[in-house]
Amino acid sequence: MRIVIQRVSHASVTIEGRVKSEIQKGYLILLGICEDDSTEDIDWLVRKVIGLRVFDDENGVMNRSIMDIDGEILVISQFTLFASYKKGNRPSWLRAAKHDISIPLYNEFCTKLSAALGKEVGTGEFGADMKVELLNDGPVTICMDTKNKE
């Protein structure tokens, strides 16, 4: 499981001309799921996302978490995070999980993240053509991969 976390001032996702979800200060998370991902991967990522301290304290030091600032989170499914580009110039997404695996894991991630955050996270629509708008804050962008827990 891979995520890209972007610290944002605000973000939204629009599908077919209609805003599905929007947030103010917090995280926009792009979530990629591969075939061997599990509930354990979700639990690890949720703990990391909730505990991550990348918001400034009163001294301008990144020392506050999403919980400390009462922030919001928008989660967008993003199979392209598992692009393979070893051969040729057109990427392949063979490592990305199929819908029957990825949809339940995406939903579980969002549910567990909402529970940990104490409020509903915003979501896109799995498999839809989405227009995602965001205003990066910093910018601060962090990548996490459950297969490489550094």
Where are these regions (language model features)?
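N-terminal, polar/charged subdomain of small-to-medium soluble alpha/beta proteins
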Residues: M1-N89, A97, I103-E150
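Glycine-rich, phosphate-binding/catalytic loops in enzymes
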Residues: W93
